[in-house]
Amino acid sequence: MFYNFLLYLVIHVNYALDALTFNKFLSLDGIVSWPMIIKDRVYFLSDHEGISNLYSVNLEGKDLTKHTNFTEYYCRNASSDGRRIVFQNSGDIYLYDPEKQELKLLDIDLPTDRKKKQGKFVEVLDYTTEAIANDKYLSLISRGKVFLMRHWDGPAVQLGEKQGVRYKQIQLLPNGDTVVLDTNDDKLTFLSKDGSIKKLNVDLGRIERIKVSPDGKKILISNNRLELWLYEVDTTNLRLIDKSEYDVISQMDWHPDNEWFAYTFPESYSTQSIKLAHISGKVIRITSPYGYDFSPSFDPDGRYLYFLSARHLDPTNDKVIFNMSFQRVIKPYLVVLSNTYSPFNQSLEETTSDKKVEIEGIEDRVIPFPVDEDYYIRIEGAKNNKVFLFSLPIKGYRYPGETLGKLEVFDLDSKTKELYADNVKSFSLTIDKGKILILFKDSIRLFDVNTKPDLNATGKKGGIVDLSRIKVYVDPEREWKQMFREAWKLMQQNYWKPDGLKDWESVLLKYEKLIDRISTRYELSDLIQEMQGETKTSHSYEMPYDYDTAEPLPIGGLGADYEYDKENKCYKIARIYVGDPTNENERSPLRDPGVQLNIGDCIKAVDGEEVKYNILSYLVNKDQVVLDVITKGKTKRVTVKLLKDEKFLIYRYWVEKNRQYVHEKSKGKLGYVHIPDMMYQGFAEFYRLFLSEFHREGLIVDVRFNRGGFISGLILEKLLLKRMGYVVRRNGKELPHPFFSSPGVIVAITNQYAGSDGDIFSYLFKKYKLGILIGRRTWGGVIGINVRDRLADNSAVSQPEFAVHFHDIGLKIENYGVDPDIEVDIKPEDYANGRDPQLDTAIELALKQLEEKS
């Protein structure tokens, strides 16, 4: 983002930081970084001319001088010893001598074994992304490599290219050969047991899903162009079946006759139907375009099409805010494909099983399952009238980690549903739908669909597939090259503007030639991120998974700040962070019952060891400690349970300090709300504070440091609900109407660290004329992402895909930000002295408006 970055200079020198005075002395339209003072000049890196180079100015911020003239790669990571400057440019390190005005490329030879580039074996389950089976074989993808083996014994064979490749979207053919997507060239690829590799050399864009017919002769292909194609293996005929205008056609299934197939079809931004098609080209919509239907799956006998639908709208009252929500809306349904009885309403006479698909009146043959709604995400029809239902628990953001689901089986004969397996990552059925393959966190298991699994049993009896047969070998150098190129290709294919990446091929050449110079996975991340930076677009991220580094040792937290007391040789408690003790991790352990330490108390020893060094070093990898504390001249011994993470406590302390300050300065007239992001935490924080603040005469909404997200519209919706009157009652104070409506005066504070949806909130706050916006210009990144693509080592990469365009200003927020109505900065000395000029200005403006209204 091209901020107007600033450098500050101390113009009044004093040894105490809180006595220093800083003035803005340089402003450039670009990124200014790594400031270094050498003699009477300030040196720094800046990209205000396009490519980052080394510059300097005098101590008055004048006489801007350029010292380097690199035109291809950025100068980065500058440092100085007070006389000279070193910095990085591409894979080289340069030394600049200001006195001699001399630039020198350093010849650095590091005699190391480059251990991180050496080959290694990895655990198969740690990187297993897909697994599938038929009646004989099981195939899976781990670390982007395809392995094939028999269910219970025999060797595991690696198919296709062994290194430098990334396969995905695996499908098994009846003979055990596989069909996959090769992400190196985005081609549909056939991998044979005999080692041969065949490709469908047609440009279909980024293939998102493939589904092979039961006989292995036809393949459905969906892509990022929102198209659905049908490929006939024997004739090599390729036909376009359908195309959406809204989203990827993501789910398909084949009828057992190999002629009919069903697929999801996005009808709008929020609705999706299911269509039924014949290989002849006939296509019909069989569910309403006004709901959200998904997960089509045929009964293996060809009688029914099962699917899930989020259409059961049964609202419940929210327990916190005056609102209603739909907690569980997804229900399983089936379509009777021929004009016969529903399985839930059998006739007295025996009916024959009819596999024929009858189109006429099919939309009237949609029947709900006799089960309650739940958070179902998948349905699969299996042999012997079994139907598998996979659901996830509903949980909030405070419960991180992988979400494991519940797998249930519904029996069409008995009309009952029972638990089949819990803590499931994913599952798939064999081609004949007679066996089920379940992926757990610690195993892959295969069962007959009629068998109740014994998850406590071991070996074959417990359905456990022996994965020790698979050896996943990784050649880092070849893998890094593949990952880099895939990250480049994903950007090429998913970037929001088709012609937006000019000369993208030259960008590949520019950075790919540096790959041989990297030695660690971290350096690969750095290289990918530099390549992504060439888009000059926000939200271009690489999120690494496998740095292969030692886990950092955790440091327990006391929820306090300290100062070393030289006289008593102990750490004096300078501040105890006070949060909300009713919230987890928001109470300082020093204030726990039985501990009750205070500011000024001095920690003399930890676990009997006298504190001689930084106190944090005594809290490493500990959950609980015994402290010897000098309090009121006496030594007290207390046992303290440490915090694993202090950030929630410190954040709550900061918010509550601001809120109390606003209340005191306004004499209770103004409320205060801080929104840390526009995601789950931000939504919770807004209502946590708004519920106790909305009844006041005015409100300050603070979105400084807002990390973005997607719920700004929900916050604005509440702020736009203006108070039109009151509900008067006999006892108690009157209630605002509408309830939870916003007060008449609102002032918002933003800054340069509010971005993405924080940018959007800041802009719409002004546009809706909700009040005055003060602070600093925002981050400037409003082209959104859908992080769905992962590289071979599970690292995630994003591509800017969704550009936010406003009627009046178009795309101008991107790479610029949102200007406040009134600019107010916070200088370093303000931070040092605990002052907040932005908050003070907001209070002043809100009180002035209240006075004018009265």
From Swiss-Prot:
Location comes to: Cytoplasm
Q: Which SUPFAM superfamilies match?
A: ClpP/crotonase, DPP6 N-terminal domain-like, PDZ domain-like
- Recorded GO CC terms: cytoplasm
Gene3D superfamilies in the record: 2-enoyl-CoA Hydratase, Chain A, domain 1, 2.30.42.10, 3.30.750.44, Tricorn protease N-terminal domain, YVTN repeat-like/Quinoprotein amine dehydrogenase
Q: Which residues form the signal peptide?
A: none
For this UniProt entry, what is the primary localization, expressed as one broad class? cytoplasm
**Disulfide bond sites:** none
Q: Where is this region: PDZ-like?
A: 554-646
Which keywords appear in this protein's UniProt record, sorted alphabetically? Cytoplasm, Hydrolase, Protease, Serine protease
- What Gene Ontology terms for biological process does this UniProt record contain? proteolysis
Family as reported in the entry's similarity comment = Belongs to the peptidase S41B family.
In UniProt terms, what function does this protein have?
Degrades oligopeptides in a sequential manner.
Indicate what this protein is called per its UniProt record: Putative Tricorn-like protease C-terminal subunit
Q: Per the UniProt entry, what species is this protein from, by scientific name?
A: Sulfurisphaera tokodaii (strain DSM 16993 / JCM 10545 / NBRC 100140 / 7)
